[in-house]
Structures are given as structure tokens and as C-alpha cells.
Amino acid sequence: MQRKGDSIKPYIKDDSGKEGWDVIKPQLEEAKAGDTVTVAMNGTTVVPKDVIDSIKGKDTTLVLDMGNGLSWKIYGKDITDAAGDIDFDVTVGADAGKSIPVDVINNVTGERSSMNLTLAYDGEFGFTATLTVNMESKNAGLYANLFYYNEQTEELEFISAGQIDPDGNVELVFTHASDYTIVVDTKIMSDNGQADNKADETIPASKTDDSTSKYTWNNTIIIIIGICIMLIVIGAIF
């Protein structure tokens, strides 16, 4: 339990006596193959580079419980090169995704339910991180489609998708931080949300069959005329 006057520190979940990264790091280094170490972030958001490096290449999973139904999962063998100290803070809802124009979001979401999400860190992680976010139990069984906003193209790009579990939770894979939109749908959406919205449009039938038919008919007439000429010539000879 946090005492008055103490600085806020993360701690190993279910063992609040082990708090602070200087204590947590040795626990990660000593973890056995297949172990999962869950850290309650306790209001903090930044994880030092040396802590992430402590599980690099190992069969160890670090879970960061951010609170409010949000948690990060980092698998040691997925770490290629930690970029540095990383701020894993996540903003969801109305205060998130402010760099994404409303018309860009609407063009992809249409009538679908959606939620904006912003990561505090800017740039590549140097590893794959899986975020668990709650999309409400009413959406259980549906798919949460993650779209990244590309500021250069000013478009939303499909990143990944996950099926929402009975409790409303879904796991989504991230490799870098930015502004995102999560779109709930009955299926996994394509990498072009705009194209998906046009699925019901009628596509004009090709005119190939019509032109081919005319070509075939013209050939038939030529053959018939040729046969008639041959019969006339043969009749004249005999």
C-alpha cells in the first residue's frame, strides 16, 4: 500500500512489497522460461529501456497493468531493439485521436461503432507490444479493427484485428505509437476501409461478351458465303 509522502512507484502485482524498477528488474532477470511477470503501473506510465532489455530474447512475458481495463503485454523474444525509455500511456475516447480529421474517420467507419486511441510515445517501439482494451461486453464476438492514421497520406491504414471476448476485452498488436481508430465490425476489415464501404455498389457488366458475340456472328456469315461460292463453282464445272 502506498504510504503518504512516498513517491508513486510501479510494483509487482500481488506482491506490493516489490516496488520500483530497481526491484522489478532483478525479478525479470531471474524469471524462468515461460514465466509471466505482471507489473501494476500504479499511475506511472514510463518503462526504462534497461527493464525492457532485461527480458530481450527470453521466453518471458512482461505485462503492464495500466489500470482502467488497459494492459500491455511484451514478449521477450519479440524484442529486437528497445528504442529507449518508453511511455506506455494510452488515451481512449473523446480525448484521443485529435489529429485524425472527422471526415477521414467517417469515411472508414460508416455506420459502424468506433473508438479513438492515442499512445503517448512517438515512434517505433523496437518490438511488438499487445494492448488489451475493453470494447464493452455488448460487442462480444465481433471484431475490433485497428487503423493507424498516416499523416503523410491523410488516410487510415489497417494494422490488425482481434475478436472481442465475452467480457468485452480484445488484444491488438502495435509496433509503434501514434493516433489510431478502432472500428467494431462483424468481420475483419480489409486494409482499405473505404473500399469495404463500397462492397454493395453495383459494378457495370463487362461488354466483352457482346463484342465477342458480334465477332462470332460475322465469322459465321463469311463461312456460309464461302461455302455458297464453292458450290456455284463446282456446279459450273460439272
Residues covered by each model-derived region:
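Proteolytic cleavage junctions
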Residues: M1-Y11, N107-V233
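Proteolytic processing hotspots in large secreted/extracellular or virion-associated proteins
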Residues: K9-E151
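Juxtamembrane cytosolic interface motif at the C-terminal end of transmembrane helices
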Residues: I234-F238
